[in-house]
């Protein structure tokens, strides 16, 4: 695979941006062994945004020859009071439900679950004096204003009254990038500010400098799209507003969970926001794109329609679908029907896992109080 083919894998949907593309191209051209990481708070059930969208980029990176890592951020979750702030519960859920779910999704998407490393935050920090020196070093090079500005990482507006612990979170996240040796830190577009901080301190820190071939570099940040909540009532006016209106595991009606049954998926999609002719921030279109158009199709997607409205339609590419919907040639009800079926087919192996060997994991999650 040549450099441009590798680059196209990284840049394809659902990638929103890479900072910077030219830096990544140079790293690929150099033939360096590159490390990736994406971090997750440990909280409630994994939905399709956290699971399928994120892991689709992990699979793309695997194919591009990048070593991938999923970071299970137990300490961050504790600081942010997830799962009631119970650290033991957070850790247990991280290494059981989260690991098993992500592995199943990677496999469903055509990747290799064994090729991705899973790292628990506590394990990275344990008996690691250099990490704590790194963290302190990072704080020496950040201002209070910079840290407060990045607090949307936590889903909290910086003008609110917040515990001091929350101010530790952004430097901690920046430190993880370097401690993991991540040339490509990855997350949703809502993680952008933290990754910008990492780039800003990259040439200043003394501990865990990020290097290739002995040369210090800045991390190349990779950000994927956020799935809008199913129950949004209007189009977001900005990316910042979208981060507030993304799918949320603590609001069940806003999200499709990866363990949902086909009938639950149909019911949720049927109620989803899907205005006629509107293609921007349309959660149903986004869901169909990730479920049916991530890979080049070998057969057309068939959208069933009544004969009086023109009969069935065959679609090969997402761009065709979007254009037809924008022109009003596809009714929202027909779009919802095909989306629900495509999602149910994609997630069927995950659903069956949680109906069988993974049932105990799901039951434990149902018994845990979920905090947002």
Swiss-Prot record:
Residue positions binding ATP: 249
Principal location class: cytoplasm
EC number: 6.1.1.1
Signal peptide boundaries: none
Catalytic activity entry: tRNA(Tyr) + L-tyrosine + ATP = L-tyrosyl-tRNA(Tyr) + AMP + diphosphate + H(+)
Cysteines joined through disulfide linkages: none
Gene Ontology cellular component annotations, sorted alphabetically: cytoplasm
Function description: Catalyzes the attachment of tyrosine to tRNA(Tyr) in a two-step reaction: tyrosine is first activated by ATP to form Tyr-AMP and then transferred to the acceptor end of tRNA(Tyr).
Family assignment from sequence similarity: Belongs to the class-I aminoacyl-tRNA synthetase family. TyrS type 4 subfamily.
Protein name: Tyrosine--tRNA ligase
Species name: Pyrobaculum calidifontis (strain DSM 21063 / JCM 11548 / VA1)
Gene field: tyrS
């Amino acid at each position: 695979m040549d450099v441009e083919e590798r680059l196209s894998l990284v840049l394809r949907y659902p990638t929103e941006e890479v900072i910077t593309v030219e830096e990544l191209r140079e790293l690929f051209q150099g033939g360096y062994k590159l490390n990736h990481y994406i971090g997750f708070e440990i909280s409630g059930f994994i939905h399709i945004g956290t699971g399928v969208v994120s892991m689709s980029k992990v699979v793309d990176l695997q194919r591009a020859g990048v070593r991938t890592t999923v970071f299970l951020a137990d300490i961050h979750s504790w600081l942010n009071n997830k799962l009631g702030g119970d650290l033991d519960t957070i850790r247990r859920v991280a290494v059981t439900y989260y690991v098993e779910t992500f592995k199943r999704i990677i496999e469903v998407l055509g990747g290799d679950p064994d090729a991705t490393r899973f790292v628990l935050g506590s394990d990275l920090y344990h008996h690691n004096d250099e990490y704590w020196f790194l963290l302190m070093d990072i704080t020496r090079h950040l201002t209070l204003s910079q840290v407060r500005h990045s607090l949307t990482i936590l889903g909290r507006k910086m003008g609110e009254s917040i515990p001091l612990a929350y101010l530790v979170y952004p430097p901690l996240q920046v430190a993880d990038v370097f401690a993991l040796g991540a040339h490509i830190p990855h997350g949703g577009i809502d993680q952008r500010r933290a990754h910008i901080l990492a780039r800003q301190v990259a040439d200043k820190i003394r501990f865990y400098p990020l290097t290739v071939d002995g040369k210090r570099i800045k991390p190349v940040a990779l950000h994927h799209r956020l799935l809008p909540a199913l129950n949004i009532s209007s189009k977001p006016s900005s990316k910042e507003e979208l981060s507030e209106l993304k799918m949320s595991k603590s609001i069940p009606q806003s999200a499709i969970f990866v363990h949902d049954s086909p009938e639950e998926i149909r019911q949720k999609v049927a109620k989803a926001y899907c205005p006629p002719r509107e293609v921007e921030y349309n959660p149903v279109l986004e869901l169909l794109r990730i479920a049916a158009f991530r890979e080049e199709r070998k057969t057309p997607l068939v959208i069933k329609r009544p004969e009086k409205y023109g009969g069935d339609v065959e679609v090969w590419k997402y761009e065709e679908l979007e254009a037809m919907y924008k022109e009003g040639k596809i009714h929202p009800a027909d779009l919802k029907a095909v989306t629900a079926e495509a999602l149910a087919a994609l997630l069927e192996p995950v659903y069956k896992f949680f109906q069988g060997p993974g049932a105990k994991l799901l039951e434990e999650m149902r018994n845990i109080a979920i905090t947002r």
